[in-house]
């Protein structure tokens, strides 16, 4: 009997290992600041029943040999200053600046080492942060590389970089939900059928502290290399407003969607996956209550010069925290709300946490009429403005319907004059 129980426990343990969910995130670097260090590469983030593992694959042709601190930052992006990312991420406000340890801040990592314009592969294993729904989730936040190094670096005396404090960001990336199809085999997680990627942002993010934004950049599917702009997601207690301003797109209708993954592994837009959805949701237009969470319809309203396209929607259909860390796409053609979602993805980006936005950020004209189905094609916003009332051409009361004194005097004198003439003729 005891052997049977032990055997069952072994089997159940094996099943739990095989079917264990995992988390996968992806973070693609780009240079920031006044000096372009031409830093490229990415970080993969994986966890499965344990610590969060970060694996770096980064290169640079402009960084001198030395050591450079890395840290997880509070914001994924800051529209007013792309090097001010809100400071190193802290869960409880405790900790001091140092390499990851018991006394460090949650977001403090380690130093990267640069030699011959190559940043060496590095591996961090963390327990202070996660990429699953919890107060210490870093989905939607950023990883920054600093000009300075941590003082805990034993090699600091042999390199040219200065030792803290960490003030000068030279590169950063937005931590997005990764596409499971791209998990490197060397990352040590079991992605077999039945295991789900449960990465996500903290579901109780403060709507008084954060908004979210995606910066758009063209993909290799775009005929234009000049697509840009951004989409702002402004959070409130019971809704999310979506304000988009997009430049460089063709003068046509474009599908406009939130996608499942904030994963920029591929430059053609494929790695952001399908639309963000849950369960049995189907592709449809707003405000269909069974549609994908990511179905925002179309982008079709332009300014008079057709230089910028504008989008606006306020909805309570999806949560603010649910969209953080996901991908976003502008499509080449119109989404028909049925089987055709718009073809190639001509622009993409990752939804990042940002500080609570000023009311003027991504402010679309408030007197335009916005629609997202766009069945009649493109139009200009100015054409939707209600015309001002034109001055009335109806005669004033003193002119016609309510004649004044002068209106009565003229016929009266005519009558008197006619009577006098008649009397004279009789005489």
From Swiss-Prot:
Chain residues that bind Cu cation: 257, 259, 275, 331
Subcellular location: Cell membrane
GO CC annotation terms, alphabetical: plasma membrane
Residues annotated as binding Zn(2+): 275, 283, 292, 295
GO biological process assignments: removal of superoxide radicals; response to hydrogen peroxide; response to oxidative stress; response to UV
Region annotation Disordered: where it falls in the sequence: 381-404
Membrane topology: Single-pass type I membrane protein
Topology, Extracellular side: 21-406
The reaction(s) this protein catalyses: 2 superoxide + 2 H(+) = H2O2 + O2
Cofactor section: Cu cation; Zn(2+)
Role according to the record: Protect the extracellular space from toxic effect of reactive oxygen intermediates by converting superoxyde radicals into hydrogen peroxyde and oxygen.
Family the entry assigns: Belongs to the Cu-Zn superoxide dismutase family.
Protein name: Extracellular superoxide dismutase [Cu-Zn] 2
């Amino acid at each position: 009997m005891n052997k049977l129980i032990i055997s069952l426990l072994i089997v159940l343990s094996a099943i739990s290992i095989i079917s264990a969910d995992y988390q996968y995130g992806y973070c693609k670097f780009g240079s920031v600041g006044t000096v372009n260090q031409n830093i490229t590469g990415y970080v993969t983030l994986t966890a499965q029943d344990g610590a969060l593992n970060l694996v770096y694959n980064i290169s640079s042709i402009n960084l001198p040999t030395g050591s450079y601190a890395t840290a997880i930052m509070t914001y994924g992006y800051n529209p007013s200053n792309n090097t001010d990312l809100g400071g190193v991420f802290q869960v409880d406000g405790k900790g001091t600046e140092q390499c990851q340890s018991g006394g460090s801040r949650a977001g403090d990592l380690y130093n990267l080492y640069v030699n011959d314009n190559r940043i060496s592969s590095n591996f961090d294993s963390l327990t202070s942060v996660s990429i699953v729904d919890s107060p210490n989730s870093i989905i939607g936040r950023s990883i920054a590389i600093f000009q300075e190094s941590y003082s805990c670096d034993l090699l600091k005396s042999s390199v040219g970089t200065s030792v803290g404090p960490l003030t000068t960001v030279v590169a950063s990336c937005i931590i997005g939900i990764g596409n499971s199809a791209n998990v490197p085999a060397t990352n040590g997680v079991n992605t077999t059928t039945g295991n789900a990627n449960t990465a996500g942002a903290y579901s109780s993010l403060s709507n008084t502290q954060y908004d979210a934004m995606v910066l758009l950049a063209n993909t290799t599917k775009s005929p234009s290399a000049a697509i840009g702009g951004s989409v702002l997601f402004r959070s409130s207690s019971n809704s999310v407003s979506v304000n988009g301003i997009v430049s460089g797109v063709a003068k046509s209708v474009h599908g406009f969607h939130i996608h499942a993954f904030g994963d920029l592994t591929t430059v053609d837009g494929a790695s952001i996956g399908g639309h963000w959805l849950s369960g049995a949701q189907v592709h449809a237009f707003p405000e269909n209550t069974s549609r994908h969470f990511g179905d925002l319809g179309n982008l079709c309203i332009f300014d008079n010069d057709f230089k910028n396209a504008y989008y606006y929607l306020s909805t309570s259909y999806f949560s603010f925290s649910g969209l953080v860390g996901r991908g976003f796409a502008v499509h080449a053609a119109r989404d028909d709300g049925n089987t055709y979602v718009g073809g190639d993805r001509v622009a993409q980006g990752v939804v990042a946490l940002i500080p609570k936005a000023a009311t003027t950020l991504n402010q679309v004209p408030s007197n335009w009429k916005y629609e997202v189905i766009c069945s009649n094609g493109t139009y200009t916003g100015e054409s939707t403005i209600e015309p001002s009332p034109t001055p009335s051409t109806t005669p004033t009361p003193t002119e016609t319907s309510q004649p004044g004194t002068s209106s009565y005097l003229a016929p009266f004198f005519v009558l008197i004059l006619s009577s006098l003439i008649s009397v004279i003729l009789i005489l």
